[in-house]
Amino acid sequence: MDVKVKNRDFWYSLHGQVPGMLDWDMGNEFFLPCTMDQCSFAEQSLAKYKIQLTKPPALPQKKKSNFDDDGPPAEPSLWMWVNPNIVCPINSKEAPNTIHKILPSAPFPQTGESDYLGTQRMVQSLSVLHTEHHQQQKLLIYSTAPDFIEEETKEQECTSSKKYSKKHTVCHGPHREKESWPRPPLNYSHLVALALKSSPSCGLNVQQIYNFTRQHFPYFRTAPEGWKNTIRHNLCSLTCFEKVPVDLEDEPDGKPRSFLWKLTDEGNRFFQEDTRVLAYARRESIKQSMRQPELIDLLFHL
């Protein structure tokens, strides 16, 4: 290490010695919140005054043996001057080569043929044990794999059968139920007119109209209950339908009088001119929404 100083011999002669900074009171310096060189001049004067009044505690210092035979005997200190060439010597000024060389494999020590053969047998036995352990793990994996596959297939079959039973339910009669039915392309007035036109001459009550709609158009079996209010609103607000009382002869004594709904003359024209024309135009979509699509000609008088 090349230390760039003017008088090298003088500085090198101070190796391991404490040439200066001996008047720095380190004992009192430890009690200060900051070093004195960081304070202002007034604070430095005050600190020096306090130092004069306060005596630092006596710190026992024992001389230690010097293990460095090259330099003079000295006690290590905070301000000790050292020669870097002695403390951390460097052989060459060039940076060491950092390329790692691959070392050849060390041969077996030639202590004897018997030792070499014993070592060779030990290595072979270890390799055989490793391969046997690896093969046992493979056998365990392959032996448990078919059972695991069978359990998975059984679970899949059970889940698929449950899904199939939920989706494909058989109803009463020759017709199979669908998972979801489309909404018929008809207004509620058309549905009411269709139900009353297919009824006997005496008419139908509100519950019978509900049953007719659910029977031929299964969409309303799972639809929200609001469609019933819409049908009642059409019955009461449109002039195509009228409410007629039931004959007294048909009613038993002691029960309130009931009413039936029928088509008026305007309602019959509405069925012929509007409902039948709509059935001609949307025949296929209506058949898809019907539970018995073969009855479309009979219901709509096509």
UniProtKB/Swiss-Prot annotation:
Localization per record: Nucleus
Alphabetical list of Gene3D superfamilies matching this protein: Winged helix-like DNA-binding domain superfamily/Winged helix DNA-binding domain (1.10.10.10)
Taxonomy, superkingdom: Eukaryota
Xref: InterPro entries: Fork_head_dom (IPR001766), FOX_transcription_regulators (IPR052328), WH-like_DNA-bd_sf (IPR036388), WH_DNA-bd_sf (IPR036390)
PROSITE patterns, sorted: FORK_HEAD_3 (PS50039)
First-listed, main subcellular location of the protein, grouped into a coarse class: nucleus
DNA-binding region per UniProt: 183-285
Pfam families: Forkhead
Coiled coil: none
Keyword Transcription: yes
Listed GO CC annotations: nucleoplasm
SMART domains reported for this sequence: FH
Keywords in alphabetical order: DNA-binding, Nucleus, Transcription, Transcription regulation
Molecular function per GO: DNA-binding transcription factor activity; sequence-specific double-stranded DNA binding
PANTHER family reported in the protein's UniProt record: FORKHEAD BOX PROTEIN R1, FORKHEAD BOX PROTEIN R2
UniProt name for this protein: Forkhead box protein R2
